[in-house]
Amino acid sequence: NQISKYDPALKLAWFIPRVIIPKKTRGGKDYWIVDVIDDSSQSTKIKCWGVRPGDEIFINRPYVAKLDYDETWGFSCRGVFNFKMIG
């Protein structure tokens, strides 16, 4: 799936997180799968690598974030510090 307002040149997108699913890599490192929705009601998953204790994202609040996109793996980011609340 695609975030409708993703700008590939700037690597920026805005969205609203709906669900955060904490996971662990095979090596035991924490990461999140964040299920987000955009202004066209399209649901997309973002993998957030390098999550640290104390990191927090608020559900149902608008965010803008710098994201990487890969055709095979979809959207990802390296740390929650890339997420900026805009509301």
Label each PLM-derived region with a short phrase.
Residues 8-11, 50-66:
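Short nucleic-acid-contacting surface segments enriched for D/E, G, S/T with interspersed K/R
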Residues 68-87:
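OB-fold/S1-family single-stranded nucleic acid-binding modules
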Residues 23-27, 38, 70:
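Acidic surface patches and DE-rich sequence motifs
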Residues 1-22, 85:
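OB-fold nucleic-acid-binding modules
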Residues 28-57:
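Beta-strand/loop nucleic-acid-binding surfaces
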Residues 19-24, 43, 72-74:
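Flexible loop/turn segments at secondary-structure boundaries
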Residues 12-16, 33-35, 45-47, 64-66, ...:
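Structured core elements
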